[in-house]
Amino acid sequence: MATRTQARGAVVELLYAFESGNEEIKKIASSMLEEKKIKNNQLAFALSLFNGVLEKINEIDALIEPHLKDWDFKRLGSMEKAILRLGAYEIGFTPTQNPIIINECIELGKLYAEPNTPKFLNAILDSLSKKLAQKPLI
């Protein structure tokens, strides 16, 4: 049985494919997750994250951008965008505790992205979580 960490990793892969231009990924997300042995509760969890990010993608991007400082969101790599979007969605729109979300995103960064990415993700998501702690979205 898959863990939530594995489910999040699969969601990042789906978001990466979507960001890379694969619009069809929305139609086959469920079957792709099942191929990765993500089933039952974790499948529902993963699909809720994936669909939630896509549903609120413009709002999520607008949440992330002010925390990038000297970076332009459009110039970020697709994997970095995928992880940031997942993290920002969970921080802003789910009841999961922020330290758990940030740690999961750091681990996903270690697994999927460049060596400096985990520090970058930590800084952005920590800044975002502090801002949203003052003015929550939910």
Curated annotation (Swiss-Prot):
GO terms for molecular function: RNA binding. InterPro entries: NusB-like_sf, NusB_fam, NusB_RsmB_TIM44. Gene3D superfamilies: NusB-like. Keywords: RNA-binding, Transcription, Transcription antitermination, Transcription regulation. One of its GO terms (biological process) is transcription antitermination. It comes from the Bacteria. GO terms for cellular component: cytosol. The keyword NADP does not apply. Belongs to the NusB family. Involved in transcription antitermination. Required for transcription of ribosomal RNA (rRNA) genes. Binds specifically to the boxA antiterminator sequence of the ribosomal RNA (rrn) operons. PANTHER family: ANTITERMINATION NUSB DOMAIN-CONTAINING PROTEIN (PTHR11078:SF3), N UTILIZATION SUBSTANCE PROTEIN B-RELATED (PTHR11078). This is Transcription antitermination protein NusB. It comes from Helicobacter pylori (strain J99 / ATCC 700824).
